[in-house]
Every structure is written in C-alpha cells, then in structure tokens.
Design a protein with these regions (language model features):
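Sequence/structural signature of beta-propeller domains
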Residues: 1-339
Length: 339
C-alpha cells in the first residue's frame, strides 16, 4: 500500500494498493473523500477528518506506459479555463484556479481505456470529476509508524483551498503548516462497496498534539513562525527503534530551518539541527540499528535563499558567501545515536 499527497494547490490524498505485496507494477488507485469532524473554520491544530475512498481505476505499469506513448491530453480530458455555460462540464478546483472539465467526448480511446488513462494520466482532474476532496495545499512528505499503524503527512502550508468550504475542508489559515497523522485500518470498502485489499487504509486524519506551527508577527530577526514550533514541514521520516518522528523544514518563515525530533509517546518536540540562514533542511532518512547505532541522514541546500532583515543581511550574508560559495554549495551529513 502506498499513501501520498502531492505538492500542489487543490491536491488530493491518494492511495495505491498493489495486487501483490512488494510489487508496484499492478494495482488499484484510490483518492480520499473527506468528511470534516472538527469545527468548520476552526484552528488547523484542532482539525480532524474522517476518510472514505473513491476507486479511480486499476492498471499495470505496461498498460500505462502504452497509453502514455500513444495519447495526448486532449484524447483524455476536455478542459475549459472559463465557464462554457454547458452543464456537461463539471467545475473543479485545479492548482488554485477553476477548470471546467469532462472526459474527451471524441476520444480515440475505447471507454474502458479512456477512464483508465484519465485515472492514471490526468489524475487530479479525474479525481475531482469523480467527487474527490481536492482540498489540500502543499502536502509534502509521508512516512509510517508501523507498530502503531499510523502514517504521517506533512502539510507545508495550510491556506487557499483548505480555507474555503468548496472542497469538503475548511480550517483557519496556518502558513506555518502542520503534520497530520493517519489512523490505518483494514476491512475498508470503496465507494462502490468493494473491499479494499489492504490493512493500511487511512480512515482518519488529524493533527497530533504539538505538531502544528504558529504564525507570528515578524520578530527582530525576520521570523514569522514561532521558532519553538515547526514551520512548513517538508521531509518526514520515522524511527521505529527510537519511536521518533523526524521533521525537516522548508520554510521562508523561519530564518534558520530546523530538523525536529518528535517522540510519539511523550509528545515532546525537540530541535536537533539548525541549517544556515535561508537554507532548506532536506535529504532526510532514518536508518535503525546499523552496528549498534541509529543514523539520521540530513542535508541542506540553497543557503542564503531569502530576503533577510537588514541586521541579518549585514551580519550573515558575508558568512554565507564565504563559507558556501555565494549560496551555491550545500552539505550532506548525519547524526548518530547509540541504539
């Protein structure tokens, strides 16, 4: 089972369930239908959703490769960017704008191949056409806590399509973002009442205690997110041995981006690494128990890539230019913990 979102406005939560374990060459694709159980317009930190799944289609890698090599977008979907005043089109949100869409009426593809191509090659628009909740903004990394059957998704910024009620989700804007947890269960069915062949299906999505950022007025250093909380979470990795979720930031709201460690038992959040000003904390990986150690791989890129307040610009820019080749170099490293 593969669970993922994508870095998009009006993105969905998608799930792929392979026909055979450890073989992703064939399977079923699903998209989430969200029901908000928390207060509409309430704080993102308290947001809570139940999830059902819409079946989009089944395919093999060979089938999709063959389609990709033979069709063009207009063979799949008829898309208008202004209202055609035609009820055969459905209005959808797509990357922050309105589209009016329907399956291509004069496609060269037979009906079964048309819907398959739409599901796997025009996934966003087809998911919206099928009634999915295309609400999410900036959904980034996903990881899993196997023991507790909890997955985690980074919502780098909570804004735009998540703050209206057009797409089944309405929470207060939180540019600092949050990490959402997914409760994973078996015994689920799709919108057609057909069993989903997985024990790892998300049925609930919520923000755990301590995993929401906080927007603030700009401080003296230029931070617009509280530096003692996460901001724009991006990379996520979970260490089963340490019972810890590691969170890397890609934020323009912290002058220095951080790598955080969140213990899922104590709910304690700790900052364990700071990158140079303007750099992104990325390349995150957790490797449990190698020769008695757990390793956290991490790197940073594009140091100095932000507009600093004057005092920081004067103090920091020369150091970035001197130490990181005018901002064009990066560094890769690791932290080691005794297992």
């Amino acid at each position: 089972t593969a669970l993922m979102g994508d870095d998009f406005t009006n993105s969905g939560l998608f799930m792929f369930v392979a026909d055979k374990a450890a073989d992703l060459s064939a399977g079923n694709l699903y998209v989430a239908k969200i029901s908000q159980t928390s207060a509409k317009g309430g704080p993102a930190a308290a947001s809570d959703f139940s999830i059902k799944w819409i079946h989009l289609g089944h395919a093999t890698s060979a089938e999709i490769e063959a389609l990709a090599n033979t069709v063009v977008p207009t063979d799949i979907m008829d898309v208008k960017y202004t209202d055609p005043n035609d009820t055969s089109y459905k209005k959808i949100g797509y990357d922050g704008a309105n589209n009016w869409v329907k399956l291509a009426p004069n496609s060269k593809l037979p009906a079964d191949k048309l819907t398959q191509a739409a599901a796997f090659l025009e996934t966003h628009r087809y998911a919206a056409l099928q009634g999915a909740s295309m609400a999410f903004t900036k959904m980034e990394g996903t990881t899993v806590n196997i023991k507790d059957k909890i997955a985690y998704s980074a919502m780098s910024r909570i804004e735009k399509s998540m703050t209206t009620d057009e797409y089944d989700v309405k929470v207060a804007q939180l540019k600092s973002g949050a990490v959402y947890a997914h409760e994973l269960k078996g015994g689920q069915v799709d919108n057609n009442g057909k069993a989903i062949n997985s024990e790892w299906v998300s049925t609930r999505m919520y923000v755990p205690e301590g995993l929401a950022g906080e927007d603030i007025a700009k401080d003296a250093l230029g931070n617009t997110s509280n530096i003692d909380k996460i901001s724009c979470p991006d990379n996520l990795k979970f260490s089963e041995k340490m019972r810890t979720l590691f969170i890397g930031e890609d934020s323009g709201y912290h002058v220095n981006n951080y790598l955080w460690a969140y213990n899922v038992d104590t709910k304690k959040l700790a900052r364990i690494l700071s990158t140079p000003a303007g750099a992104e904390s990325t390349g995150l990986h957790a490797v449990d128990e190698v020769n008695g150690y757990t390793y956290i791989m991490s790197n940073f890129q594009h140091p100095g890539d932000m507009t600093f307040v004057p005092a920081v610009e004067t103090a920091v820019r020369p150091l970035i230019n001197q130490n990181f080749k005018d901002g064009y170099s990066a560094a890769v490293g690791y932290l080691a913990f005794k297992a």
